[in-house]
Regions:
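Positively charged n-region of N-terminal signal peptides that target proteins for export
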Residues: 1-4
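Membrane-proximal, proline-rich intrinsically disordered regions
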Residues: 20-73, 327, 337, 348-353, ...
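C-terminal/domain-terminus segments
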Residues: 230, 234-235, 242-244, 356-357, ...
Length: 630
């Protein structure tokens, strides 16, 4: 009996192991694998980056790049309660990338596919840098620990160095010779640089530059960070040819999937008629920043009666930074306004190659939450006062096309960061030269995305729809004049100010770089007037009003910029009472992740707890001149 039992047991074990082997073979099914080659992760990881544009719906209004009738709570420096709005970057980092990205990097390292591993780490550093500037404190050390039901938060001063470390490791791996044969697989799955390791190295250096650039207002920036920024800047994107652009397929309704079209294009209709160019971007790009009476805060009505006065009925600040209204003089007109901003003028595209006509167009900006602005009504990004429609707008224009690439990083952006660093170090010569190069690079980027419209020749409006209202030839002509003119080429070392650098950077980032623009505004505390190291209640704002620097204050960085409850005309609103008078300094963590499942960890944060009513007003570490005031 004992022998029979042993025989049966051996037989059962043999049967069990055979069955198990057969079962496990299912996991090697080519149609339903549980493990894929590392390179197959890449296209999906990059594609997730389109979600960064989703969160621009919040940060573009927060940075006053756009007004919105949709994300109005963010336009009002608040947040959407009980909602995942503005939480897509969080979702990308922790879920869409998450373990997929970790697996790709680890598998690539095991395969000695160093280029792919380096790309993965560059992707991680870039995404986390953006997320850390938006949500500030994050679960990092425990983020991907298996089995955890809650995750402790790490502070920004710990996360920032780790982001740079990931980028440094990416550079190291990308510089190694692969011991893996990709064939065409890497090129075909990389929508940004088509597997070009040298370009990814520049990109990773750029991530470090952007990370360090948010620290320029810290007391130790020059001694601790400036030289690092410049070192990496010299190795980052060098020209518009290096720009990090993620391709899209386009195709409108003919595309296999809707998301193959750009999020901002005509077909997907996400900008439609609910997002508009702000009055601030229109003012600085058209040279119409007004004069405010510092006693009353009101704009000063002009006594002039010419045609320009009927367009802009207020006295203008005599010291415009970007451009002015003297368009008949060479170099006073910035042609980027004709590409980046929209106008309802010239709907037949007859004059896109006529300099005088292009210069005389009128541009209108929105209020914070509506198309109607202080001097007129802003059109949508396609130049009309209605929802986007292929019959009228075609495939779109500029970077608002169905097939437009997603803009991740530009050489202009990097050079503005370097110019700011040089300026902070007192090296005005290099600051000036780098600043001029940055503006030229943004001109090159801007014209590269133009899709000039075609004249209608008397046909119905919709016969040849869409496109940009300036030709490439005219843009280049006017760009050359502008670069040689009084706002760029004729600026001297002694005349260069921080306003020149940061406001030109703001224009270059419009609107794809709203996340970085909002970071810059926060690190300079929105040009709020305060004493000491940082603003607080009754030292920069009251419960009802923000006290901002006047444009005549030489220390004011963003001339013409005023928050909603400021002391000037068209800005006399109020914030939600839960802000206690403060502007917004951060995006709250994704609701369905943290407020539903990780609230205890969130509530432990200091100096303002993550479950506090005014957590969105907690100042980030990068904006404190020293450390956190714990």
């Amino acid at each position: 009996m004992k022998k029979l039992f042993i025989v049966l047991l051996v037989a059962l074990v043999g049967f069990a192991s055979t069955s198990c082997d057969d079962f496990l073979n299912v996991n090697e099914n080519k149609d339903a694998p549980d493990k894929v080659d590392a390179y197959l992760y890449l296209a999906g990881l990059e594609s997730a980056w389109q979600g960064l544009y989703y969160d621009l719906r919040a940060t573009a209004p927060l940075s006053q790049m756009m007004g919105t009738g949709s994300y109005t709570s963010y336009a009002a420096n608040f947040y959407s309660k009980g909602s995942d709005a503005a939480g897509e970057t969080w979702r990308i980092a922790y879920w869409l990338h998450g373990m997929n990205l970790e697996n790709m990097v680890n598998q690539a390292k095991a395969d000695e596919a160093w280029t792919l591993a380096g790309i993965g780490l560059a992707i991680k550093a870039y995404t986390w840098d953006i997320m850390c500037k938006l949500q500030v404190e994050l679960p990092m050390k425990q983020a991907f620990e298996v089995g955890r039901l809650s995750h402790d938060y790490d502070y920004q001063d710990e996360i920032y160095p780790q982001i740079r470390a990931w980028a440094e490791e990416a550079i190291e791996l990308l510089s190694k010779e692969d011991n893996f044969a990709y064939g065409t697989k890497l090129k075909e799955n990389d929508r940004v640089f088509q597997g070009d390791a040298d370009q990814w190295i520049k990109f990773a250096h750029g991530v470090i530059v952007n990370n360090l650039a948010s620290l320029t207002n810290k007391k130790n920036f020059v001694s601790e960070y400036a030289n690092q920024l410049l070192q990496h800047g010299k190795l980052a994107l060098a020209s518009a040819n290096d720009n990090a652009l993620m391709s899209t397929v386009g195709g409108a309704a003919d595309a296999q999937f809707s998301i193959y079209n750009n999020f901002w294009g005509v077909y997907r209709g996400n900008l439609s008629n609910s997002y508009w160019q702000s009055d601030y971007i229109v003012q600085i790009m058209t040279g119409t920043v007004p004069v405010y009476d510092e006693t009353t805060g009101d704009k000063v009505r002009t006594s002039k009666s010419d045609s320009r006065a009927t367009y802009y009925p207020y006295e203008l600040n005599p010291k415009q930074i970007i451009a002015d209204t003297l368009v008949e003089l060479a170099g006073h007109f910035d042609p980027r306004v004709a590409a980046k901003l929209s106008t309802s003028d010239d709907i037949t595209y007859e004059d896109i190659d006529d300099a005088d006509s292009v210069k005389m167009r009128r541009y209108y900006g929105s209020s914070f939450t509506g198309a109607s602005g202080p001097i007129g009504t802003a059109p949508n990004v396609f130049g009309r006062f209605a929802v986007s429609n292929k019959a009228y707008d075609g495939t779109g224009r500029w970077i608002f096309r169905d097939d437009a690439p997603y803009v991740l990083m530009t050489s202009a952006q990097i050079k503005f960061c370097m110019a700011e660093a040089y300026f902070k170090m007192g090296d005005k010569a290099n600051a000036l030269a780098t600043w001029k190069d940055a503006i030229k690079d943004d001109m090159d980027f801007t014209v590269s995305q133009l899709l000039p419209g075609k004249a209608k020749d008397g046909a119905d409006y919709g016969a040849l729809p869409g496109g940009d209202k300036i030709s490439k030839a005219l843009f280049n002509q006017l760009a050359a004049e502008y670069l040689a003119g009084p706002f760029v080429g004729q600026i001297t070392e002694s005349e260069l100010t921080l306003s020149h650098i940061m406001m030109q950077k703001y224009v270059a980032l419009w609107p794809w770089g709203a996340n970085e623009a909002w970071t810059d505004l926060r690190k300079y505390h929105y040009d709020i007037k305060y004493s000491g190291d940082y603003p607080t209640l009754d030292n920069g704002w009251t419960l009802t009003t923000v006290d901002q620097k006047w444009d005549t204050d030489e220390s004011k960085v963003y001339k013409g910029f005023y928050l909603a409850p400021a002391q000037v005309q068209n800005r006399r609103g109020t914030y939600n009472v839960e802000n206690y008078g403060s502007p917004c300094y951060r995006i709250r963590p994704r609701y369905n992740s943290e407020y539903m499942w990780n609230l205890n960890s969130l509530g432990a944060l200091k100096p303002i707890a993550g479950d506090a009513l005014n957590y969105q007003c907690s100042i980030p570490w990068f904006a404190y001149p020293d450390g956190y005031p714990m």
